[in-house]
Amino acid sequence: MKPKHTQVPMSTKVFFGLGMLAMQMFPAALGVFMVVLVQDFGFDPVMWGLIFFLPRVVDAITDPIMGFISDNTRSRWGRRRQYIFVGAILMGITFITMWQLYPENGLTYNFWYFLILSVVFYLGLTIFSVPYVALGYEMSTDFHERTRIMAIAQWIGQWAWVIVPWFWVIIYDDSWFSSPESGTRTLAIYVSLFCTALALVPALFIKGKSSLHDENLAKITFGNIKTTFWTLIKGFVDAAKNTPFVRLCAATFFIFNSFQTIAAFSFFIIVYYLFQGDAGAAGIWPTLHGSVGALLTTFLVIPIVTRMSEKLGKKKTFMISQAISIVGYILFWFLFIPGKPYMFLFALPMFSFGIGGLFTLMMSMTADTCDLDELKNGLPRKEATFGAIYWWMVKFGTALAGLLSGLIMSYVGFDANLGEQPEGAMTGLRIFYTVFPAIGTLIAIYDMKNYDINEERAKEISSILAERNKETN
């Protein structure tokens, strides 16, 4: 039996994409603002690394639990929307609060204040993002429609990376704010209100199917906690046995988190290598690195990757796009040139294929592996559990990347308090900036060599599931 696939209305795709913009803008703004912790609040590299690492460890623990809860929620609103709503509100309130930092409170107080509120913020992000991502996985059963949904979501979400780098310019501009600390406190309020409004859109405007009387769902109660725990563990075991899904997680871990380890170095390389530590002279060049890269991803990478995927298949498109990104990383070594800051812009088109291609394809491919899980293990479907485990890999890796960033800066001898860096410090940062993500990407390409869900197999699985569900009904 050939399964019937319903095309998702463009309005629904856009509503989903607005949630993606919020999900990307909150962390993007956080990354920009965190430079202020080093530059203006005096956080040393190790403290900076811990601020990155510890909240994300907590986040990585809570993600799979949230996935299980969402997958098994019985509600007339469905399994996703109410959590998206609550998570959006919690993120918004906490983001404003965590950035109300004042230098006169002292380094130790500011460190603990920010660390504790970061944990709460990431809890809100978990409550929002896990059911939100699952909502996207279950919007369509069609192999290519899934890619189109994620492509539109990523296209909208990429605007976060176009907009947010300009926050550097705003908070360091004396005509806007008296100090970067003041700029961060104020800008955090506007960013939070905007992102919270976007995050609420999927909860309010994407219709959910009632799960109130779904007997396939596990009962989540404190009285049933033992059964609930073992059902949760079984979901993890099922995911771990799903070899294509494990390959997606591993590839994402190596690509995204090797990139995350060196991402903040772009600011330091531009300011301290191209402009000898003069942030004022660096002007908008750090901003252009992020903003132009995001624009290229939005208007070049995502359309090309989406089209290639329909013609060549998702796996082959993944391999090609990641190979292109390695060329981009290598070009950065040659194109960061003091006195010619514009040269690094020529590396950005190829560099942008890495992350831009990764999430456009991987979120679609994860939905395909959820079908495989239903084929092998039956109902309930585990979109949120799979999404949570996938993003657990991303977030745990990001936590590790944050810690590694601080350790690498310490290892090479980088000191943000110095204008001119010690001999070898900038060379060390530049070597890591090129070599570290290139190695991570090569490992991911090797891992994906044996990924085996192509369009033909995906359609075969969908047909079997459609026939099975018809018989059940």
Please identify what each model-predicted range represents.
Residues 2-473:
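Membrane-embedded alpha-helical bundles of multi-pass transporters/translocases
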